[in-house]
């Protein structure tokens, strides 16, 4: 892989990882257009590792929130009188809400990495989930805040999150934000919950995939092109920087805007992918 391709893919990952537009779908189509085999061991390892950059960006951005939630959860475990703290409940919610996606990832690992990685699946999921987001965005009474989250809310959001690895085009953030909206949280809170619910799952998946696939970076081929550690590290750093900016922008955007633009964007991208497949520019 050359340095320019590494920068391009790092930017794509950084921009799309936390937006409700499917980072997996974008990476796969861009990797295809750049000439890589998206089911090749090398490019699969590359994709898993550069996602760690975006995950680190989220941890850095929400570090004070993470520390506050962890401290509240630990205090609640030690002292019953501290269990009324909303952050204690949120801590349990994040733990319980992370279980469904972990189970799905382990049980359906082979299908996720093969059959379900088809660009047809990505394109159709991008388009169809836009309708789900549209319904969620038009819920009445979207006024619940972060302090109102309960265990049931977290489990519902977690179950929605578990759909993302099964159907890559759905987008993990698209699924969790939609769930938050259906639970009547305001858009800003639904988005922040999406980050909090996603961080444990993304960290676990990132570590697992990176460790298990790291050797493929140096010995495997991404299509006809070797990947290499230099471009991989560069892409990871680029994804970290771009993802940090993307997170800040998204939180500011949702504080005063609906998700309509993202919905239409998803439909357009889905149709473009279908067009590229039908015209044999890329293979599914």
From Swiss-Prot:
What keywords were assigned to this record? Antibiotic resistance, Cell membrane, Cell shape, Cell wall biogenesis/degradation, Hydrolase, Membrane, Peptidoglycan synthesis, Transmembrane, Transmembrane helix
Under InterPro entries, the record lists: UppP
Name the principal localization, coarsely classed.
Answer: membrane
* GO BP annotation list: cell wall organization; peptidoglycan biosynthetic process; regulation of cell shape; response to antibiotic
Q: Where does the protein end up?
A: Cell membrane
Membrane-crossing residue ranges in chain numbering = 1-21, 43-63, 88-108, 116-136, 149-169, 193-213, 225-245, 259-279
EC number of the protein: 3.6.1.27
Query: Where does this protein have coiled-coil stretches?
Result: none
> Which superkingdom, per the lineage?
Bacteria
Q: Which GO terms describe its molecular function?
A: undecaprenyl-diphosphatase activity
Q: Which reaction does it catalyse?
A: di-trans,octa-cis-undecaprenyl diphosphate + H2O = di-trans,octa-cis-undecaprenyl phosphate + phosphate + H(+)
The family classification in the record reads: Belongs to the UppP family.
The UniProt record's further free-text remark is: Bacitracin is thought to be involved in the inhibition of peptidoglycan synthesis by sequestering undecaprenyl diphosphate, thereby reducing the pool of lipid carrier available.
Q: What does this protein do?
A: Catalyzes the dephosphorylation of undecaprenyl diphosphate (UPP). Confers resistance to bacitracin.
Enumerate the NCBIfam families for this protein: PRK00281.2-1 (NF001392), undec_PP_bacA (TIGR00753)
PANTHER family referenced in this protein's UniProt entry, alphabetically: UNDECAPRENYL-DIPHOSPHATASE
The name of this protein is Undecaprenyl-diphosphatase
């Amino acid at each position: 892989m050359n340095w320019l391709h590494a920068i391009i893919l790092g930017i794509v990952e950084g921009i799309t990882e936390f937006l409700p537009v499917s980072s997996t779908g974008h990476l796969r189509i861009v990797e295809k257009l750049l000439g890589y085999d998206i089911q090749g061991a090398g490019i699969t390892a590359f994709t898993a590792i550069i996602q760690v950059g975006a995950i680190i960006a989220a941890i850095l951005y929400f570090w004070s929130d993470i520390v506050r939630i962890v401290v509240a959860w630990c205090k609640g475990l030690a002292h019953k009188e501290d269990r009324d703290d909303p952050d204690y409940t949120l801590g349990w919610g994040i733990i319980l809400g992370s279980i469904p996606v972990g189970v799905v990832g382990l049980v359906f690992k082979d299908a996720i990495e093969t059959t379900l990685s088809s660009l047809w699946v990505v394109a159709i999921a991008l388009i169809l989930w836009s309708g789900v987001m549209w319904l969620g965005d038009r819920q009445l009474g979207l006024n619940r805040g972060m302090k109102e989250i309960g265990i049931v809310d977290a489990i519902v959001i977690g179950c929605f999150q578990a759909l993302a690895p099964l159907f890559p085009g759905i987008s993990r953030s698209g699924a969790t934000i939609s769930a938050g909206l259906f639970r009547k949280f305001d858009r800003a809170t639904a988005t922040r919950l999406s980050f909090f619910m996603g961080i444990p799952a993304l960290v676990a998946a990132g570590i697992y995939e990176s460790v298990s696939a790291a050797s493929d970076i140096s010995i495997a081929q991404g299509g006809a092109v070797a990947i290499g550690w230099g471009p991989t590290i560069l892409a990871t750093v680029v994804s970290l920087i771009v993802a940090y900016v993307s997170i800040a922008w998204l939180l500011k955007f949702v504080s005063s805007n609906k998700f309509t633009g993202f919905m239409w964007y998803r439909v357009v991208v889905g149709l473009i992918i279908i067009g590229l497949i039908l015209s044999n520019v890329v293979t599914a």
